[in-house]
């Protein structure tokens, strides 16, 4: 069973400014888990930031807020991003890189390459949840 070193929560708005708040939360996470390597920090941060950017970009017209939980455990990092939006089109399909000429569609593929992604949707008020899990290097 994993030992939780630090668990942080933030209620964020659906604006790009919330990405700054997210990075401030990352700084607090790393302060509470200084043993996490730079590589693990970078991979986890990339995955979470890509999902958060998608939530903001695609949810802008439908909802104003989202919730972020960050957790550092002795053997993994974990993030939960929840928003009240509807099922995200394409979220349940395989996340692969688009063709080089594509103008978008790389966010989920980058996140999946950096860490393990889980997506769930329910009809409760929480709506959709993205979970990012990153196993720490031994």
Each language-model region and where it sits:
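Flexible, glycine-/charge-rich segments associated with ATP-binding catalytic modules
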Residues: 1-17, 112-138
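Helix-loop-beta hinge of the Bergerat
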Residues: 3-38
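Conserved short strand/loop->alpha-helix "switch" segment adjacent to the catalytic nucleotide/phosphoryl-transfer site
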Residues: 27-49, 100-102
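Short helix-loop "hinge" at the ATP-lid/N-box region of the Bergerat-fold HATPase_c
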Residues: 55-59
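Short beta-strand/loop element within the Bergerat-fold HATPase_c
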Residues: 65-75
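Short strand-connecting beta-turns/loops that link adjacent beta-strands
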Residues: 73-76, 124-126
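Glycine-rich/acidic phosphate-handling loop/turn and adjacent ATP-lid/helix
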Residues: 76-105
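Glycine-rich phosphate-binding loop
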Residues: 101-115
